[in-house]
Amino acid sequence: MTKGTGGAGRSGGLDQAAVKTAYRRWAGVYDTGFGLVSRPGRRRAVALANRLPGERVLEVGVGTGLALPLYAPGKTVVGVDLSREMLLKARERVERERLTHVLGLFEMDAQAMAFADGSFDLAVAMFTASVVPDARALFAEMTRVVRPGGYLVFVNHFLAESGPRLWVERAMAPAARLLGWHPDFAREELADPAVAEPEIVEPCPPFGLFTLLAYRRPAAA
């Protein structure tokens, strides 16, 4: 399996300051740019979340709130994001579309969230894993705030294993700070396959560029 450059060894690696700077720049154009290409993956992730048991949903990396109108009646949603500018857009969407199922939107580091253990039935992270400085810390923190037996849902771009796309993604890696995400982010950087295996792995359009993953937190003994 092809591996990404990973963590501190990355060229042009992201830190919180770089993420905030990038999404301050992208906030005004995100919906009409990346928002369009990411729509199929976003819809599939929320459709899966809507089918999973439990009412309390945490959306990690809520961004401009593009997914918020898609949640089914009966789900309540709390969203977090590191970017104040993206959250402003999300709050405007909640008010404009009267999304009463959205209980709160908070500026928060997804790697160290201010929620008690087991606060949510499921956590959803769409196009977030390749943005945070430490994806393993993100995975661990999402696991912590989800109740035993609950689910973690991800949709994300992952590094190709071979072919021209792999070359392009590696060539783009030094631009991570400018882009606001890691083009060479490999799936094993999210979770150690020896420790956590997804129950669902589903390629998403366009052209299988994104992948939907679902992990179940083991039930309490």
What are these regions (language model features)?
Residues 136-148:
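A short glycine-rich, Lys/Arg-flanked "PGG" loop and its adjoining helix->strand segment in the class I
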Residues 13, 17, 34-36, 153-212:
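C-terminal alpha-helical "lid/dimerization" subdomain adjacent to the S-adenosyl-L-methionine
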Residues 213-221:
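C-terminal lobe and adjacent flexible extensions of AdoMet/dcAdoMet transferase-like proteins
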Residues 56, 76, 149-151:
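Short glycine-centered segments of the SAM/dcSAM-binding site in methyltransferase folds
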Residues 2-52, 66-67, 89, 93-97, ...:
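Conserved class I S-adenosyl-L-methionine
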Residues 122-134:
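A short SAM/SAH-binding and catalytic strip from SAM-dependent methyltransferases
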Residues 58-112:
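Class I SAM-dependent methyltransferase SAM/SAH-binding core
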Residues 111-123:
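A short acidic, Gly/Pro-enriched loop at the edge of an enzyme's catalytic core
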